[in-house]
Amino acid sequence: MDKFRVQGRTRLSGEVTISGAKNAALPILFAALLAEDPVELQNVPKLKDIDTTIKLLSQLGVKIERDAASGSVFVDASGVDEFCAPYDLVKTMRASIWALGPLVARFGKGQVSLPGGCAIGARPVDLHITGLEQLSAEIKLEEGYVKASVNGRLKAAHIVMDKVSVGATVTIMSAATLAEGTTVIENAAREPEIVDTANFLNTLGAKITGAGTDRITIEGVARLGGGVYRVLPDRIETGTFLVAAAISGGKVVCRQTRPDTLDAVLAKLREAGADIEVGDDWISLDMHGKRPKAVTLRTAPHPGFPTDMQAQFSLLNLVAEGTGVITETIFENRFMHVPELIRMGAHAEIESNTVICYGVEQLSGAQVMATDLRASASLVLAGCIADGVTIVDRIYHIDRGYEGIEDKLRALGAKIERVKGE
């Protein structure tokens, strides 16, 4: 397995170009199963999860090609002839459940192995299943597979979601585009990636309104065609590089990003003492050589503070002036990076879904292990500012969600190299 070797005590400064959002590109790729004509997706990041999705869609009979130079992916789902997403691909990535809604909506049948992915607590697929059942799909759980079928077209429904779920909102919204009648989703997720998926589907001819609010309306259509669509920039990658500069007293400019998707994160960075400026598609952060101040925050569904930035802000608090408290309300078991940071000299206490961070002036390099995608990013950033050398193991997690992170960090002055596994 590959590792990162990071030499620390670096002030990270410079410019970084932000990639397309993984959390938008994945649902959009699966939603392309609904299109009867070819689709071109631009600004698709080069990531392990994207590669897995392309492989999975190919197995279903989708003709799919990536232009490495431009970052575009060309999808032709006119010849889909297989309706089962098998365990060997699904086990590494729980986003595969997003194949189910489009398959049953367009072809009347689909089955997906129960998913895998990051080991951060229980992320059940129940909300996906109940949503599809309300759209009149018949669901069976057999031999580790979720099997969905319907006679004729799905039927529209008024769906009130038990809890806010990005994944289930995507599933229901995608499937409802081809249902008979008008579907309303109440208590829908409001994330920018939901809006991006809805905008993509509308480009193909869907009739979706209200995405970005808690009430989405989908007027079903008979078919979806093709089109060209550009995936929005990755707000979590943007936030990660802003934190990299903030914890090292540095200065960074993030290009080709969307400041309007990061209000909660920018507010907390300003509270930590960062000098921040924004334009239409750029954000600059300057710490003027100072240590950040500790902040207190709670993760929450959008437009609240994103859970995917929690690990990076845990690190910020652990090297900040003062004491900060972080409460994780979205996922259980999402503080697995904290014991690793304690190995590097951090001082923290975990109580249930809260971590109390007592800032220290300096971390020390150590051998640490990545446990999930965002935790691994925080460990790499910790290595950049720690005294000595840090080895980050199991970095396959980071390759799932950050495109060329070592190259981008090197451009900011980091001393980081990938050590190939045996």
Swiss-Prot record:
The modification 2-(S-cysteinyl)pyruvic acid O-phosphothioketal is found at residue 118. The active site is at 118 (proton donor). It is an enzyme of class 2 (transferase). GO terms for molecular function: UDP-N-acetylglucosamine 1-carboxyvinyltransferase activity. InterPro entries: Enolpyruvate_Tfrase_dom, Enolpyruvate_Tfrase_sf, MurA_subfamily, RNA3'P_cycl/enolpyr_Trfase_a/b, UDP_GlcNAc_COvinyl_MurA. It comes from the Bacteria. Keywords: Cell cycle, Cell division, Cell shape, Cell wall biogenesis/degradation, Cytoplasm, Peptidoglycan synthesis, Pyruvate, Transferase. One of its GO terms (cellular component) is cytoplasm. Its EC number is 2.5.1.7. Phosphoenolpyruvate binds at residues 22-23. GO terms for biological process: cell division; cell wall organization; peptidoglycan biosynthetic process; regulation of cell shape; UDP-N-acetylgalactosamine biosynthetic process. UDP-N-acetyl-alpha-D-glucosamine binds at residues 94, 123-127, 163-166, 308, 330. It catalyses: phosphoenolpyruvate + UDP-N-acetyl-alpha-D-glucosamine = UDP-N-acetyl-3-O-(1-carboxyvinyl)-alpha-D-glucosamine + phosphate. Belongs to the EPSP synthase family. MurA subfamily. NCBIfam families: murA, PRK09369.1. Cell wall formation. Adds enolpyruvyl to UDP-N-acetylglucosamine. This is UDP-N-acetylglucosamine 1-carboxyvinyltransferase.
